[in-house]
Structures are given as structure tokens and as C-alpha cells.
Amino acid sequence: MEGERAPLLGSRRAAAAAGVFAGRRAACGAVLLAELLERAAFYGVTANLVLFLNGAPFNWEGAQASQALLLFMGLTYLGSPFGGWLADARLGRARAILLSLALYLLGMLAFPLLAAPRSRSFLCGDPHPELVRNCSAPFPNGTAVCPDAAARRCAPATFAGLVLVGLGVATVKANITPFGADQVKDRGPEATRRFFNWFYWSINLGAILSLGGIAYIQQNVSFLTGYLIPTVCVAIAFLVFLCGQSVFITKPPDGSAFTDMFRILTYSCCSQRGGQRRSGEGLGVFQQSSKHSLFDSCKMSRGGPFTEDKVEDVKALVKIVPVFLALIPYWTVYFQMQTTYVLQSLHLKIPEISSITTTHHTLPAAWLTMFDAVLILLLIPLKDKLVDPVLRRHGLLPSSLKRIAVGMFFVTCSAFAAGILESKRLDLVKEKTINQTIGGVVYHAADLPIWWQIPQYVLIGISEIFASIAGLEFAYSAAPKSMQSAIMGLFFFFSGIGSFVGSGLLALVSLKAIGWMSSHTDFGNINSCHLHYYFFLLAAIQGATLLLFLIVSVKYDRQRARTDGGTASTRT
């Protein structure tokens, strides 16, 4: 296949008159449906992974299970640059997505196998019985000797499945977003903006279906059934994307932007050192702006080996990276939604819900995440159809960087609200505890309804509408055409760093020297820990970063305004 294959491109003007998606609805619909199913599978894994590993027969501690989930989510983002490179240099975006969905499906098979007793015994061996000590409950003499952290059962098989799924998710994540935008990019920035809105809407619809149905089945029916359903979702997503090949706009791989980027950076650094050694000879090369001369020396017109376009693309990337760096604390807080927020949920009073059987069912702790997703489903159409058009007509539509800053403010408020709630929960635990069984595990909860967590989830949902959507839009629109997959991969790469930072901080505060989360109690109880300190620490880090981000964003907007006249035609 040579060049770009674009079905139904005959009459662009007529299509534009009929609507920005005219002639592209089948392609966009296939992308959105595949993403919806993929997200349903992803949240089917992550929503109750802490509960799955925290319960019998695995009996991982709450902090251990939370760290595993944070590491998994970090991998799904850190692997994105590799997925972008694979698409750009070897396979093309469409084939890379198909391959990653196949790998995704292979990894998903591990979870129903771990949930089934016979296959679990084959993979992990027979369990060794251990005495569980309830160290968090009061003793008559006020003393209790807690055991050290127990070995994590089935850890190799669990992490193998998580790694395979993580690599599949990473490659899909890096490519499906720009691939979907490719279907409408010739229709202008308005089509791209609207696609990203509906793309994010599909992500959250998949999340709601997964959290509302799959999480309920996992907690109250069976983890085996609850993990078979997301496995089937990945299989259907693979078939949908395979069948959509006839209507997709596809492009062959045209070289890796990452390869060019590293070659240019290496050459520029070497030439800078050589130029500094010759600086006393009166050449005056580095008497100009060092930032420009550093990369301009790579151009053929300046005696370098690289074309003008490639050097300019790398210069554009270097200007974008500080924004991605500033988003790391945002993602660190964001990923608490499915880890420490869930751990907090399990230690609040969770109501029972009616069922058609005589078995008592409890409200899935993961359902709180739906407040975030439902809010996004409701507000994105409102934003797309009403708010944005009104702001645009009056010239008040904020830039993507300004929207990211607003999102940072709301996520800071979310972490702060979680810390306040945890402080109150610990006060109530000292007075009275409630024993509640969730997923086969007994938790000693505070007599405080789980609904008090709604504000922190709502605040994260509002932050997503501003920061996450604007971040995707910024990564795609600020990227040169030759580096769109690469920059999208870097966007997710720095998101993954945020998840790893959260895992690292959680491990750090679990050290006995700090003692915030160092209590090894009945596989997950946090009543003798100080989780609120962790939440307040996250809020403080994000608040300080917000101030720095405002400086970075203002500087970037000014630089963009200076160069926009010459490069706007290559950006969306």
C-alpha cells in the first residue's frame, strides 16, 4: 500500500457542508466502539483488583495490592512511546492497534484462570495456610504482635498477566487516539475538537458499563464470571477493529520520529561541546540564543546532517515537554481514584443492596468511581453543544493550557477532601467499628457512610473535563504531523510516571521509619495507619505544581503566539 488510503474522500466540500463527520461516521464509530469495549475491559481489571488480591486465597495486604495496581497503570502509560514507535517505524497505526489488541486478549486470559480454583492451583500451586491476626482490633491488654508482611500468593502469574495487558493497553493508548483523529483531521480543528470530546465520552461510557455491571458481578457473584466478561470485550474490540479496516483512513509507516529525535538531540549536544571548545576562536556561534543555536546547528543549511523540517519538529517537541512534566503530579493524584480511594471506601460503611436471591449483596466500592464517569458523560455533551459554542462566539474559549490549569486546581481539591474525610474516619474508628464482609474479606470500617466520598470523586471528574481532555487535545494539536504518535506516546508516558510516583510515595510512606502505612494488619486494614497524611502530601505537591504550571503555560503560549504565523498551517 503506497501513500495514504482514504475512502470516501471524493467531495470534501460537500461533506463539510453536510457536517464535519459526514462520510466518516462509520470509521469514527468503529474507533469509538473499539475504544469503548477496550475501556470496559480495562476498568474490569482495575476496578476491583485491590479487592481481588486483598481477598482469599491471595491475601495481599491493602498497600501491596494498591502498589500492584499503580505499577500496572504506570506500565500502561510508560509503554506508550514504544507503541508509538512501533506504529510509526514498523507497522502503521492500524496494524499496531490490531497487534496490541491480540496481546491484550492474551493477557486478559490470565485473570479468569487465576479466579478459577483448578487453574489457579496449576499456575500457583497449593496455598499454605496462614494465621491471620486482627492487629487493628483492640486487645484487652492493649498489646498485639503483628506478623510481617506475608508473601504474595500467585505474584508471578498475576504480574505476568498485568504486564501483557499493560503492554497491549499501552500500544492501543498511543495509537488509537491519533488514529481516530486522522479520520477527521482534514475537516479542520473543529472536527478534531469534537472528535476528542466524543472519544472521551466513549471512554467514560465504557467505564460506567464496566463499573456498573462487571464490578458488581465481581464483588457479589464471582470473580471468574467478572473477569470472563472483560476478556470477551477485548475479543469483540479486536473483531470490530478488524472489520473496520475497509472504511478507515490509514497510512503506512513512514519512519520513527523517536529515532530522528534522539539522533538530533545527540548531534546537537555533541556539537555544543565542540562549539564550546572553539568558543575562544571568535566564531561567535554560541553568542546567539543558546536554545536556538543548539538545534539550528543540526540543519543542513548550517552544515548539519538533518533537514530543516526534522529539526523544527524536534524544537517543537522540546517546547511541549515542560507541560507534560508539569502534569506528573496531576496524574499521581488522579490514579488514587482506583487505588487508595478504593482502600478508603472499603473502610467506610457500605450499604447492602437488594438482590433477586436470598444472598445479601453490598454496594460495590468501585461504584464510587462512576460518579466521576457519569459526571463526564453528562457534562461533555453540554460542553460540546452549548458552553464551547457560546464561549467561542464571544472569543472567550480558553486555551488548552488554561483548561489544564483549572483541572489541576480541582484535582488538588479532591486530594484535600480525601484527606479531611480520612481524618474524620480515623476519629470515628477510635469510638466504634463496624465489621463488614466484602468479597470474602472482613473489614473493620468506621460508622460513616461511603457517600461522604462523593465530593472527592466529583472533583476528580470535573478535573478530567478540564485537564485530561485538554491534555489530549494539546498533545495532538501541538505536535508536528510527523510526530503525532510520538508526542501522544510521550503524553501517556509522563502520565505513567505520575502513577509510578504515586506507587513510590506509597512505598516510601510504608517504611517503618516514616510509619504512615507500615502497619501489617489483617491483609488491608488501614485503621492504624495515617492515610490522611498521604492525601495531604499529594494535595500539597499538586498545589505547588499548579503555581509552576501557570508560569510554564504563560511562557509556552507566548512562544506559540510568536511562531504561530509560520507554523499554524501544520497544526490543528
Swiss-Prot record:
GO MF annotations in UniProt: dipeptide transmembrane transporter activity; L-histidine transmembrane transporter activity; peptide:proton symporter activity; peptidoglycan transmembrane transporter activity
Gene3D superfamilies: MFS general substrate transporter like domains
UniProt membrane topology term: Multi-pass membrane protein
Disulfide bonds: none
Catalytic activity: L-histidine(out) + n H(+)(out) = L-histidine(in) + n H(+)(in); L-alanyl-gamma-D-glutamyl-meso-2,6-diaminopimelate(out) + n H(+)(out) = L-alanyl-gamma-D-glutamyl-meso-2,6-diaminopimelate(in) + n H(+)(in); glycylglycylglycine(out) + n H(+)(out) = glycylglycylglycine(in) + n H(+)(in); N-acetyl-D-muramoyl-L-alanyl-D-isoglutamine(out) + n H(+)(out) = N-acetyl-D-muramoyl-L-alanyl-D-isoglutamine(in) + n H(+)(in)
Keyword Transcription regulation among record annotations: no
GO biological process: dipeptide import across plasma membrane; histidine transport; innate immune response; L-histidine transmembrane export from vacuole; mast cell homeostasis; peptidoglycan transport; positive regulation of innate immune response; positive regulation of nucleotide-binding oligomerization domain containing 1 signaling pathway
TM segment ranges: 40-60, 67-87, 96-116, 159-179, 195-215, 223-243, 317-337, 362-382, 404-424, 458-478, 489-509, 534-554
Residue(s) carrying Phosphoserine: S279, S297
Known tissue expression: Widely expressed in the gastrointestinal tract. Highly expressed in the brain and eye, and weakly in the lung and spleen. In brain highly expressed in the hippocampus, cerebellum and pontine nucleus, and weakly in other regions of the brain, including the cerebral cortex, brain stem, thalamus and hypothalamus.
InterPro entries in the cross-refs: MFS_trans_sf, POT_fam, PTR2_symporter_CS
GO terms for cellular component: early endosome membrane; endolysosome membrane; endosome membrane; lysosomal membrane; membrane
UniProt keyword annotation of Nuclease present: no
Keywords for this protein: Endosome, Immunity, Innate immunity, Lysosome, Membrane, Peptide transport, Phosphoprotein, Protein transport, Symport, Transmembrane, Transmembrane helix, Transport
One Pfam family recorded for the sequence: PTR2
Localisation: Lysosome membrane; Endosome membrane; Early endosome membrane
Family: Belongs to the major facilitator superfamily. Proton-dependent oligopeptide transporter (POT/PTR) (TC 2.A.17) family.
The protein's assembly and partners: Interacts with TASL; leading to TASL recruitment to endolysosome.
Function as written in the Swiss-Prot or TrEMBL entry: Proton-coupled amino-acid transporter that mediates the transmembrane transport of L-histidine and some di- and tripeptides from inside the lysosome to the cytosol, and plays a key role in innate immune response. Able to transport a variety of di- and tripeptides, including carnosine and some peptidoglycans. Transporter activity is pH-dependent and maximized in the acidic lysosomal environment.
Protein's UniProt name: Solute carrier family 15 member 4
